UniProtKB/Swiss-Prot annotation:
Species classification: Bacteria, Pseudomonadati, Dictyoglomota, Dictyoglomia, Dictyoglomales
Organism encoding this protein: Dictyoglomus thermophilum (strain ATCC 35947 / DSM 3960 / H-6-12)
Keyword Isomerase in record: no
NCBIfam families listed in its UniProt record: S15_bact (TIGR00952)
Originating gene: rpsO
Example GO biological process: translation
Protein name according to UniProt: Small ribosomal subunit protein uS15
Amino acid sequence: MALTKEEKKQIIEKFRLNENDSGSPEVQIALLTERIKRLTEHLKVHKKDYHSRVGLLKMIGRRRKLLKYLQEKDFERYKKLIQELGLRK
């Protein structure tokens, strides 16, 4: 369920803005999106795992806040990110 160091590293390299970047909104949103996808798959199998469902809802809320921040701060970066992650239709 959790991301390995290698998987985190790949996501950070793909979405970072410069070579030392690991905390920009893009990177944080991409990492949260991957964790959300994995937890969603887990919950499809384990339907009664309510504790994990609460954690999933918290992650979704955190991602929503970061997306809202990025949308207000730089709309072009926001549009590019949601297209790369496939979040909106």
